[in-house]
C-alpha cells in the first residue's frame, strides 16, 4: 500500500533536459494531495548520474527529498538502455554524463545523507524508516514466491521466473 512518485530530481533545468513534463512544484503539490487523501506510505525515486548533473545538484535533490519527511526513498543510477533517445545521443557523443568516479561519489553521498536522515538502507537502492521497507523487494531478494498479474507483470513460482506479455497495444 505504497504510493510512489518518479521524481528523478528536484532540479527543474535537469527535469527539462531529460524530457520530463513535471517540475519540482508539481511534486510538492502531488505529495501534499496524497497526504491530504490519507496516504502515509509515500515513496519517491531519485536518479543520479543524469546528463549534466553535478554532485551538488544531487545533494540538493536529496536534501529536498528528505525535507518532505517521507517514509521511503529509492535512488537509482541512470541506466542507458538500447533503442532510447539517451542511447542514441550517447552513441553520437552528445550526452554529457558524469564520469564513473562522480557517479560513485553520488551513490556514497546518497547513502550518507539517507542514514543521516534516519533512514535504513535495506537494499542497494532503497532506504526506509524501519517498518516501511518494500515487502515486494524483500520477497524478491529473499527468493520467495510471488505472482505477477497484468500486462508486463513478473512472477516467481516453483523456482521459475516468468513474465507476462505487455504492454497491450491500443
Residue ranges: model-predicted function:
Residues 1-170:
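C-terminal scaffold of the Radical SAM
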Amino acid at each position: 500500500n505504497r504510493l510512489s512518485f518518479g521524481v528523478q530530481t528536484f532540479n527543474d533545468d535537469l527535469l527539462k533536459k531529460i524530457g520530463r513534463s513535471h517540475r519540482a512544484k508539481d511534486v510538492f503539490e502531488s505529495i501534499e494531495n496524497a497526504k491530504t487523501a490519507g496516504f502515509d506510505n509515500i515513496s519517491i525515486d531519485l536518479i543520479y548520474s543524469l546528463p549534466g548533473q553535478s554532485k551538488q545538484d544531487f545533494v540538493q535533490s536529496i536534501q529536498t527529498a528528505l525535507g518532505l519527511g517521507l517514509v521511503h526513498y529509492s535512488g537509482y543510477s541512470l541506466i542507458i538502455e538500447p533503442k532510447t533517445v539517451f542511447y542514441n545521443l550517447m552513441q553520437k557523443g552528445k550526452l554529457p554524463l558524469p564520469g564513473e568516479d562522480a557517479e560513485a561519489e553520488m551513490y556514497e553521498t546518497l547513502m550518507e545523507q539517507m542514514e543521516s536522515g534516519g533512514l535504513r538502507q535495506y537494499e542497494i537502492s532503497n532506504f526506509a524508516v524501519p517498518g516501511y521497507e518494500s515487502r515486494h523487494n524483500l520477497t524478491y531478494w529473499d527468493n520467495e514466491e510471488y505472482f505477477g498479474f497484468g500486462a508486463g507483470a513478473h512472477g516467481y513460482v516453483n523456482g521459475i521466473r516468468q513474465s507476462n506479455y505487455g504492454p497491450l497495444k491500443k
